[in-house]
């Protein structure tokens, strides 16, 4: 008996299958919250880098907004996205790892998580008064989550099995 077959027969496999639509809904909600933060934080960095002088009252305001966005919205949303996503992966019959789509989605989710970590490091730079990037860098980096999102959505919805779609 394959391990996957055994998992499908377990109580956990049955539980995940029974609550699949709830898990999927919570996954989509957390992804939306995470993506909102991934789109907004680089925008804050653009204005922080281009307009705000370090050590000013406005600098402190931007640092507060950036910290709260990251800690209160983005971090919990990323964690929830991962938890609900992994629950979906372990739901029997949902992911066929012999196809291409779960691998492209997984690679892009890892890249999105890496981008999140990069943003967290840049927030620490601003907090230390040590930002070394121009607004243009943050403007360009702001496009990365959009590109990753496109690949993730097409992977998860179209479930392609080869690069010719």
UniProtKB/Swiss-Prot annotation:
Renumbered to this chain, the signal peptide range is none
Q: Which reaction does it catalyse?
A: protoporphyrinogen IX + 3 A = protoporphyrin IX + 3 AH2
User: Any idea where this protein resides?
Assistant: Cell membrane
EC no. given is 1.3.99.-
Q: InterPro entries under this entry?
A: HemJ-like (IPR005265)
Extract the GO molecular function terms from the UniProt entry. Answer: metal ion binding; protoporphyrinogen oxidase activity
This entry's comment on the bound cofactor is: Binds 1 heme b (iron(II)-protoporphyrin IX) group per subunit.
- Main site of residence? membrane
Q: Where does heme bind?
A: 27, 105
Cofactor(s) recorded for this entry are: heme b
Q: What sections of the sequence does the record tag as coiled-coil? A: none
Q: Which keywords label this protein?
A: Cell membrane, Heme, Iron, Membrane, Metal-binding, Oxidoreductase, Transmembrane, Transmembrane helix
Query: Belongs to which family?
Result: Belongs to the HemJ family.
User: What is this protein's name?
Assistant: Protoporphyrinogen IX oxidase
Organism source for this protein? Answer: Cereibacter sphaeroides (strain ATCC 17023 / DSM 158 / JCM 6121 / CCUG 31486 / LMG 2827 / NBRC 12203 / NCIMB 8253 / ATH 2.4.1.) (Rhodobacter sphaeroides)
